[in-house]
Design a protein with these regions (language model features):
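Sequence-specific dsDNA recognition surfaces
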Residues: 1-24, 30, 41
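Extracellular/lumenal ectodomain signal focusing on beta-strand-rich modules
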Residues: 21, 38, 103-105
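Glycine- and charge-enriched low-complexity intrinsically disordered segments
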Residues: 62-64, 68-79
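Amphipathic alpha-helical segments
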Residues: 67-71, 102-139
Length: 154
């Protein structure tokens, strides 16, 4: 946090642009289509008065329906990435608006499964993810999503 750029935000700026745990931040523009809409969650330990800026789209998550750490991983899955790239526009740079992100279908397992997944992720390592470590749980989530959503068993 110490290396982040600093600014003198007004109370109005802080009210409008402050991020909190449960916010997802999406890349609004990229030189390549694959970079568009890449997302990160705001971690629980975010310092007070941390603001986002205009090159980022902020979407607050409903914490009664989803676990942010689950959504972080979901945002990297091919199912979600294809939808985001399909909603983007390319001229000199590839861009996407908040409306494009909101058009994506979000597949949410029950909160208990999301929490179970988060507990696993948290136990392995809170900040550095090893793809090979997550392969089994990633496969389980994909199987669940396929069984319950793709085959119409909502």
């Amino acid at each position: 946090w110490q290396d982040l750029p600093r600014t003198n935000g007004t109370d109005k700026d802080i009210e409008k642009f402050e991020v909190k745990y449960g916010d997802m931040l999406f890349c609004r523009s990229s030189l390549v289509a694959e970079g568009i809409g890449k997302a990160s969650i705001v971690p629980e330990d975010v310092p007070q008065n941390t603001l986002f800026e205009c090159h980022v789209i902020r979407l607050p998550l409903d914490l009664s329906k989803c676990v942010p750490e689950y959504m972080q991983v979901f945002s990297t899955m091919e199912y979600f990435r294809r939808q985001i790239i399909a909603q983007s526009k390319t001229a000199t740079m590839t861009t996407i608006g908040q409306d494009g992100i909101l058009k994506a279908d979000i597949l949410l397992p029950p909160m208990s499964k999301q929490r179970e997944f988060y507990a696993f992720v948290h136990q392995v390592n809170k900040s550095k993810f090893d793809t090979m470590t997550f392969a089994p749980i990633y496969d389980i989530i994909n199987l669940y999503l396929h069984t319950h959503f793709y085959q119409g068993r909502r």
